[in-house]
């Protein structure tokens, strides 16, 4: 990669790319680019119906946290924040270097809390920044500890330089999960809030449709 720092930090969204938000189809490996300003918005109230939702996330700068909170507001779900025992450097180059070391040595960071009890949830979201074109190491550590036990799981990520192998790596590491379509958000902090809302509503509506289809084959 040409610049590790760009992939560790979570940043905003450029007007030049006007909300380059992508829903990545994990089951079939396809990617669908969403331009929410060209699509009708969907009601958040119809996104999950009575589905009980849990939103799990790790955030370095606050970008992923802001998206997690938006998902919580739209779904009425519970939130669980992944926190590391150690503190990463405040400067992004320092965190870039540490993340690279963790990936190269497989020394994933210790977490403050064990995974929550997920047995009562119908749909679980897991959010992460993209670090070195893959899942951030704190979320990797969480995935080594979590057993989704057949739960429906959807990942979302924030980045400014490409997702790389984020989604296939997430699918490989999410043990016993039924992995649904995920969402990548390119530079979300510079996007207009309405555009991000539309993208999230469209994604949630798609997940709701998948739930109906899954019920139909049971």
State where each predicted segment sits:
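Short beta-strand elements in bilobed, periplasmic/extracellular small-molecule ligand-binding domains
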Residues: 79, 178-185
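C-terminal segment of N-terminal export signals and the immediately downstream linker at the start
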Residues: 34-62, 66-67
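Helix-loop-strand module that forms the ligand-binding subsite of alpha/beta enzymes
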Residues: 96-178
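Glycine-rich phosphate/pyrophosphate-binding loop and the adjoining helix
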Residues: 185-218
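N-terminal secretory signal peptides
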Residues: 1-13
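N-terminal export signals
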Residues: 17-38
């Amino acid at each position: 990669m040409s610049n590790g720092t760009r992939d560790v930090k979570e940043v905003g969204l450029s007007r030049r790319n006007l909300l380059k938000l992508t829903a990545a189809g994990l089951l079939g490996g396809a990617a669908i680019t969403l331009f929410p300003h060209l699509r009708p918005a969907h009601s958040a109230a119809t996104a999950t119906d009575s589905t009980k939702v849990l939103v799990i996330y790790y955030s370095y700068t606050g970008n992923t946290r802001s998206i997690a909170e938006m998902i919580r507001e739209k779904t009425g779900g519970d939130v669980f924040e992944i926190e590391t025992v150690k503190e990463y450097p405040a400067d992004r180059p320092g965190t870039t270097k540490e993340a690279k070391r963790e990936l190269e040595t497989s020394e994933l960071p210790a977490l403050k809390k064990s995974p929550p009890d997920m047995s009562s949830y119908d749909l679980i979201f897991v959010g992460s920044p993209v670090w070195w074109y893959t899942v951030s190491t704190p979320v990797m550590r969480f995935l080594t500890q979590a057993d989704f036990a057949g739960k429906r799981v959807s990942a979302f990520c924030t980045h400014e330089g490409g997702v790389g192998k984020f989604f296939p790596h997430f699918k490989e590491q999410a043990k016993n999960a039924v992995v649904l379509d995920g969402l990548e958000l390119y530079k979300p902090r510079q996007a207009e809030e309405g555009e991000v809302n539309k993208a999230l509503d469209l994604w949630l509506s798609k997940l709701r449709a998948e739930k109906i289809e899954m019920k139909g084959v049971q």
